[in-house]
Amino acid sequence: MHKIIKNVYKGTKPMQNCLIIINKNAGSSKKISFEKVEKCLGDDYRYKHCTIPDDEIENFSAYDAVAVCGGDGTLASILEKACDMPLKVFYFPVGTLNDKAKAERYSHLKAKCPSCDEEKGKAKPIVVGKCARLIEEDGYITEECDKSLFSYVFAAGSFTPIGYTSDVKEKQKFGALAYVSKVVEEYKPHRIKATIATDKKTYDDEFSLIMFLKSPRCFGFHFNKAYNGESMSGHVLAIRSPKHKGALGYIEMFFPFFRAFFMGLKKERDKGSLIFKKIYSANLTLSEDVDFCKDGEKHVLKKGRYKISFRRSLCDFCVIEKF
């Protein structure tokens, strides 16, 4: 009798629910379709479709998996909802630069297709960055409940507005070239008054760039040669503002940016205008409101004190580039 029951139920699995989200404003969204995603993920799921910006993204509690089709900013917004949930997140990168997907090529998370390449297709938790406002009451410092997550970069200053100011239609038509016209426009020193406190040292200065990073690349440059995808750490890259203003300041800012992004960074550095440190967490104090670029989307940090840290997700994550 036991044998018969075993045979009856052998190989049967309950259908799981999967929400497919396609951002129609993503740079190369025309490459993807609901049919392609369903074909890739297979027959184990019962699918529901959602498009951005037409539909409101619902709570994921009714789903076992979420397929995200968009760019890095789309992924970050979905991870904020899914990070602490026991579900699978399949990322189909159809953005413009797709830096997060390219970063995963340097880890063990990349997959061709979870249904046809089982070994590579096993989704795993990932390490994400977290920015939380610190509040001091009665001598105690606590984190605000409303936290912001980023999948690979959280940065402010020179060049960072390119990620969120480029025109959607231009990105869809010209791809990464849409950013080129913005480079000259955004080549200018910034003077962000801030204090960056790591576990070893505190930097109180004016900065042209402040970047918290969990990636080997950003801006399309593969420069962070110290990247370790499995580690619970990330990096902070800070470039001090030029000492001079005007034309001399523009010339002065060229050298540390060239050193960081074109020559790359393999070891920690604290020399001249350039700071590059491995961190598990760091405190950031801003003297004024600052516009940050969070995975390609604009995110305003109000004047105050914040904690940047890194944590492992509860959800499992997988990049699918071939579909």
Model regions: which residues?
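ATP/nucleoside-binding phosphotransfer catalytic cores, i.e., glycine-rich phosphate-binding loops
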Residues: 229-231, 241-323
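Conserved Motif II region of HX4D acyltransferases
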Residues: 74, 210, 296
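Short helix/loop capping segments that flank catalytic or ligand/cofactor-binding pockets
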Residues: 29, 220-221, 293, 318
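Short, isolated positions in well-ordered beta-strands
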Residues: 119, 136, 201-204, 299, ...
